[in-house]
Amino acid sequence: MTTVGENSPTTQITIRYPLSAIRCPLTSVLCFLSFFIFLAGCGYTTRSTLPKSIKTIHVEPFKNSINYIEGTGRNIYFPLLEVNVRNAVINRFLFDGNLKTAEPALADLVLKGELTNYNRAALRYTDNDDVQEYRVQITVSLVLSNTQTGETAWTEPAFTGEATYFVSGPTASTEDAAVVEATADLARRIVERTIEDW
């Protein structure tokens, strides 16, 4: 409350500030701080548990061993799928930043991969029993070797990346687009497996 005196000591003007005028600056400050705390939490990074001596990795060319004749599901040949998977893994390592890619002679780790299966399966049907959504899966076997010790760090006989796509409706997509997404999902999982499980 503020009191302002006029010429006579008996005249007083009282100015009352509404409670909302006091709360407004406090609310603004709290919103501002909350926003920056939120932004600080948005920068997700994968925490590496790699030993300090492990700094580089070489990703060998993937071998394509998918049986396109006798496989289960829908084994369609996608040209250069093994090349695309390897490139996606290398790019994911570059994006992650915990390991640098290197030539085999300079690498602390060597990752070998082999495509073992591609599958497309119906996931959801319409009321007329038409397929509405499919899931595609790319499965690989992996071996990670530590060149410093000469030992195998880990093996994964069936490591899978997957994606889904709708064949109709406003979000309709194609199998080719889903393969790209499944490849990216597989690469992300491979990198996480490599840098986290030590």
Per-region residue spans from a language model:
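Buried hydrophobic packing residues in well-ordered domains
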Residues: 59-62, 93, 113, 140, ...
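A structural "domain/chain start" motif
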Residues: 41-90, 98, 148, 192-198
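Compositionally biased, intrinsically disordered linkers/stalks adjacent to structured regions
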Residues: 175-198
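Bacterial N-terminal signal peptides
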Residues: 28-41
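N-terminal secretory signal peptides that target proteins for export/translocation
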Residues: 1-22
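Extracytoplasmic/periplasmic, Sec-exported soluble proteins
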Residues: 73, 77-85, 103, 132-136, ...
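Surface-exposed short loop/turn segments
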Residues: 96-154, 161-173
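Short polybasic linear motifs
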Residues: 18-19, 25-26, 33
